[in-house]
């Protein structure tokens, strides 16, 4: 797994050992970041929340392309070890790549200031969409989500209906949906 573009282009990232995580493939990341760059007009200065960071590939790609700060949340020990190793390998300071060892669903970063511009949600597929998007709704209600923020939600293809209903119920609108095999990547906005 490698960083596709920007300052860290070509740098290899380590993924956690085992089957608890499934890193987003290079192909999917490349398509996603092209769509995000078009929707956002680039990444310069973005404040990123990576709620289920795993290896951190999504945040590191955003940082490589000009994001200012990434808050990476992870609770799995093996994933945390890989994540922290990737931060060190890229030479990122703790002010740029802020790693948080905690369950973001139980303890969301509602006091974050400045608010998040870009949110990555790549939870285990078994997680309920209402719980995952409910956490983002809590951020919005607390002022920790920018009004024009983009929320990227990667999920299993069969769960599209539950994501749609949870998004609508919680005040988010689908901006785009792309399917890559068994994986779907949605880009959501506040409605």
Where are these regions (language model features)?
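Class I S-adenosyl-L-methionine-dependent methyltransferase catalytic core
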Residues: 1-191
